Amino acid sequence: MILYSFAKINLSLHLLGKRPDGYHEIETLMQTVDLADKITMTECKEGTTVTCSDPIVPSDERNLAYKAIDLIRSNYRITKPGIQVHIDKQIPVASGLAGGSGNAAMTLHGLNKIWSLGLSREQLMALAAKLGSDVPYCLFGGTARASGHGEKVKWF
């Protein structure tokens, strides 16, 4: 399966203060742009493998796509089959364009289809919120307003 995770920009960003959990309370307007990482997902016999065309990107538990796989496996008790994910990186690393968040979001979408999980939009959003502030938005992209620490998303 091939999926594309698109970069996003913040058209506006208001920091409203720091929360007790360490996150910042925000209000932001986000938009996807025409720059994307290509995510290739393939079932295999067992295990989890994440690779990336950019050697700077970790291929272990520090990678958000890897964390998305672990989250799905633990929440739905999936041990087999295995999954291989390759990220062809086009979005610059650590650029603030949500590259890693988008990779995690598309990994959630891909696993939902490959493993026939039948997860609803709401279930995907709840899982995404556990992975990072931009991941819920990156599930569906487009133009949206986000608040909280980014987990509350309303699309236009």
Regions found by a protein language model. Give the residues of each.
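N-terminal, positively charged, Ser/Thr/Ala/Gly-biased leader segments
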Residues: 1-53
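Phosphate-handling active-site elements
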Residues: 73-84, 108-127
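ATP-dependent small-molecule kinase catalytic core of the GHMP/sugar-kinase superfamily
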Residues: 2-4, 12-14, 18-28, 117-156
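DPxDG-like acidic metal-binding loop motif
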Residues: 65, 95-121, 139
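Solvent-exposed beta-strand sheet faces enriched in polar/charged residues
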Residues: 12, 42, 51-53, 84-88, ...
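A short glycine/serine-rich beta->alpha loop
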Residues: 51-59, 89-98
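Helix-rich "cap/lid" substructures immediately adjacent to catalytic or cofactor-binding pockets
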Residues: 62-91
